[in-house]
């Protein structure tokens, strides 16, 4: 298959359990919960997305083989100065599981990478992933109900935290919804975490730091 990628870049993971860890981000184009066009936002399942995942950007491309995609990801990693660390690629979107398959996961592994995915959880995952982070969106039904991390953007009227507490994840995070009322949402998330200690707070540190 041809992999359509919006952008590939090297940065620090800004969210969740791996916050602060260097990683190459591979942002796949397309999503099943929103077209990415502002004209369609109000009618989308996910109305609060803050990411441009439409088409191919200058740091992305179309890759016709898994090895070509893995080579593009590998070219961003600072191999000469990374002795003793395990390279990490974070497959994100959009919705990466519309494109990410077992062949790509295998190619990433062959290139020396640990493979993480950030997904809305509505699509099945290929075998071999090292880290699955599910971020539920509104009332969209989940296909993925187990993994390493569940990260819930909060608050969502159709996605209360208690709906997900029986699922099989190692970490449960609330992340304040960004936007005009982010201060209010942060306060609500803090209050919920304090009242329900199973949940931890995730903040978008990359935005605070001004990095990608």
Where are these regions (language model features)?
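S-adenosyl-L-methionine
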Residues: 1-3, 7-23, 28-30
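Generic marker of residues within folded, mature protein domains
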Residues: 16-18, 39, 191
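Conserved Radical SAM active-site core
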Residues: 3-6, 10, 33-129
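Conserved beta-strand segments that form the floor/walls of ligand-binding pockets within enzyme
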Residues: 4, 25-27, 90, 133, ...
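Surface-exposed loop/turn and secondary-structure junction residues enriched for glycine/proline
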Residues: 8-15, 57, 147, 211-212
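Conserved AdoMet/S-adenosylmethionine-binding subsite of the radical SAM
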Residues: 83-88, 96-212
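A generic secondary-structure signal marking the coil-to-beta-strand transition
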Residues: 1, 22-24, 45, 130, ...
